[in-house]
Amino acid sequence: MAERIYIFGAHSRAQTLAAYLQALCPGVAIEAYLYNNEEENPAKVGEVPVIRLEKGNLHTEYPVYIGTRGIYHGEIAHALTSLGFEKITPVDVELDLRLRNAYLEKHFAERGRDFLKIEKMKAHGISAAIYVAKSIYDAPLKRQYREEPYEKLIQVGAALTDKRLPDCSVTDDTGDNISTKNRQFCELTALYWIWKNAGEDIVGLAHYRRHFILPPDWLERMLVNRVDVILPVPLYVAPSLRENFRKRHNPMDWDYMMAYLKGRDGKEAQEAEDFFRTNLYSPCNMFIMRREVLDELCGWLFPILFAVAGHSGTKDDSYGNRYPGFLSERLISFFFEKNRDRYNMVYSDKNFLD
């Protein structure tokens, strides 16, 4: 008999959680998705109803998994407890990582592939630099983070301000750069700067709030195992990469991107279309890779982004205006999927700093 559960939340995080639980626990059946706010919620997710958290219409003996942003977990847990629920599991960052990794182990195994992670590999010596993007608009961290010796802070959008961040040893407005595009391209102005100006043989990109969780000897392991690329552990989104973007952003930007790809290379465009019907991508425009791989990626990626941005222009709201960065997450994931037989790719978890 199936174990019936509730998931609190009905949007992207909750749907991702549902995919993990259903894949890992085939005996689990989702009774409903719950909510208690005034946001616009779907009536159903797939065939599962989305219902308001109210007294009298729920099975309080069922377990509840909270699939929302962590800042809401305490408030939601209190609301659930007040209605009589006892089996409440907030899906925090640590549990999300465990579920995501277990899901990907199973996903890769079912396709006859190994899910390789950097911390499982052996070691040997090498040097490299991971550039950490930071801007004058970034909110302060609640707790101080000490950068690793291999991390270099790069101030992004430096061409748009006279203010300099004292902890940043590099700015993205020197040499060949696109620093003035930072309001649209976000951390991609750092990526472009790294491509055109950085001198390391192995380079990476992270954010001031998001860093890779790496073993101390990750550089050595990368060399001895001939790893070409380290990407963030993939994230599952529903209903597909394509529809997830089109629902959360302007669908016309997506449509123009696909039309541009088709006009440039019809075969590649079809491969991209097929990939974007799937659900897994490496988020946040983060990576560590060998220089020659970076050169190939950026030479392929930036012409696409420049074409879309040139066509779609700027948006009035700051979040929507960042569409080139959201497109690039999907494009980078597609690039490495279509080249997975050429490059030795492994994955690493990442953190999120409050």
Could you describe each region identified by the protein language model?
Residues A14-L17, Y72-A77, D138-A139, L191, ...:
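Short, well-ordered alpha-helical microsegments
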